[in-house]
Amino acid sequence: MAASLQAAATLMQPTKVGVAPARNNLQLRSAQSVSKAFGVEPAAARLTCSLQTELKDLAQKFTDAAKVAGFALATSALVVSGANAEGVPKRLTFDEIQSKTYMEVKGTGTANQCPTIDGGVASFAFKPGKYNAKKFCLEPTSFTVKAESVNKNAPPDFQKTKLMTRLTYTLDEIEGPFEVSSDGTVKFEEKDGIDYAAVTVQLPGGERVPFLFTIKQLVASGKPESFSGEFLVPSYRGSSFLDPKGRGGSTGYDNAVALPAGGRGDEEELQKENVKNTSSSTGKITLSVTQSKPETGEVIGVFESIQPSDTDLGAKVPKDVKIQGIWYAQLE
């Protein structure tokens, strides 16, 4: 920013325009004396003065343009600096988000956030009964992957990662039956909604790990302080996806290894590349209620999910991905 302001200040300096040297002025005065002696009008003097006036006007225009350009440059530097200093947007309530226009939300990061609750109690205060959970939202705040440590002789552990995906990883608009039993236990079944998102993270060593963040077909039960369950993790790639050699699960080549007949292409080391596996796997999630507001039907909490990563259609061994974050729902 300092460099931008310095450049702007430099642009605002008046432009220096060269003037005629003293020798030319002396010649001009001599010509004027001769003209007066013979009664001749000094046209050359008028031409020289006119030229100097035009040069001064041109220099003034350049100076004004430089000032305008410098001010614009300085202003843009301040705007960029302010934008970078904003950071994470303030978390809003559901009603506050609904009151925003598209242009007010665009580019702020609010669309990737789950709502919060204004007021309420720090516990699960809903009476026993059958409810319908709507607007169920899960927002990850941490992605860790279980992998070999960068330090020697260290066992595999969950390592911090760098997010390579844009802010499109939040699950939202999920709904399903939510039951509160008389003994205080709860049960939730996921039925519909935006229940998956493709995410890619990068390990400290540079390896990138893609996975499908999801809670498809989740059935979670337990106490409100900690209710958990398993869910379905579909294949990251579909059966119609073709690899660089044109091989796929339901289309493409069966065998892309150019070898004579004899079964060489179906050997064990090549089978996992030739035979695509699109089978699903399972993951487990634990949710905890931290605050609720019965008068509006809102409830929020935190979650921790562990699920497998992408297998490249069966060619790679999946890694365990731990996802931690917050969740929000409305019970009706």
From Swiss-Prot:
SUPFAM superfamilies per the record? OMPA-like (SSF56925)
- Provide the protein's localization: Plastid, Chloroplast thylakoid membrane
Any GO BP annotation: photosystem II stabilization
- Per the record, the major location class is plastid
Q: Which Pfam families match?
A: MSP
- GO molecular function, one example? oxygen evolving activity
Outline the segment boundaries, as ranges, of region: Disordered.
262-282
> Keyword Membrane: yes or no?
yes
Q: What is this protein called?
A: Oxygen-evolving enhancer protein 1, chloroplastic
Which gene produces this protein? PSBO
